[in-house]
Regions:
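C-terminal alpha-helical interaction module
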Residues: 2-265
């Protein structure tokens, strides 16, 4: 899930590994939603011992009847959900734990907030959510409209990254994290599964360099599991992929030199 992935990256970047534990659901989301069914990617809920994500929502609110979504920031002392909104959790991880052991790196710095907010407002509807609009479209017209918007957005970001190492300037911010989690999934999943196949990210020199740049930051690679990402999408969306066959490719080298240091540190 690209939204949950944002929070895992921020946890790594802020050095919160020992302060905030994680549980990870099974990559397959079936008719009963997310579960902690045993699998290589699953990290069981060691705090409450639940088998299904919905049980956590029920623990927090016995009357809860909505969807059980990820990510969740869970308060194990209060046995409560602090937040299940990824944007909120990313902001919390960025600053709320600085006094108890997180490093001082700021990914939402005051001087850049206007630019960060502007890029977030552009990237979310056109890319983060745009690929889903294309993938789950049920008419040709809706699909073409969504897919066209995706590639128009990629063109705009490609142009921006030609002259700026990161979206808001020379330093990494939360806007880049939000962009990265969509781009890292694009060639393995969205290009084929969601029919966003006009071009691949590897066909955009600056986008592809950006993906490798962020991937190679300390700790980020630990949060990327392409096999699990592919398994989730291709197995969990029977209306899009009825056979649930997971493709074996593509072969991508995220560790290759990116050369983006020339744009500033």
């Amino acid at each position: 899930c690209p939204w949950a992935h944002r929070t895992l990256i921020m946890r790594k970047l802020k050095g919160l590994d020992t302060l905030i534990g994680i549980s990870a659901v099974n990559s397959y989301m079936g008719e009963h939603g997310w579960t902690f069914a045993p699998a290589p990617e699953t990290i069981p809920d060691s705090v409450n011992g639940v088998a299904r994500l919905y049980e956590l929502y029920a623990l927090a609110d016995a009357q809860y009847s909505g969807r059980a979504t990820i990510p969740i920031l869970w308060d194990k002392h209060q046995r409560a959900i602090v937040s299940n909104e990824s944007a909120e959790i990313v902001r919390m991880l960025n600053s709320a734990f600085n006094e108890v052991g997180a490093n001082g790196n700021d990914y939402y710095p005051a001087p850049l907030r206007a630019d960060i907010d502007e890029w977030n407002a552009f990237v979310y509807p056109n890319l983060n959510n745009g690929v889903y609009r294309a993938g789950f479209a049920t008419t040709q017209e809706a699909y073409e409209e969504a897919a066209t918007a995706v590639f128009a957005a990629l063109d705009k970001v490609e142009a921006r990254l030609a002259t700026h190492r990161y979206l808001a300037g020379p330093r990494l911010t939360e806007a880049d994290i939000r962009l990265f989690t969509t781009l890292i999934r694009f060639d393995p999943v969205y290009h084929g599964h969601f029919k966003c196949n006009r071009r691949r990210i590897v066909d955009y020199p600056n986008l592809w360099g950006f993906v490798r740049d962020v991937y190679q930051l300390p700790g980020v690679a630990d949060t990327v599991h392409i096999d699990f990402i592919k398994a989730h999408y291709y197995r969990s969306h029977p209306t899009v992929n009825p056979s649930r066959i997971v493709p074996i490719g593509p072969a991508l080298d995220y560790s290759a030199p990116h050369g983006r240091e020339r744009l500033g540190a």
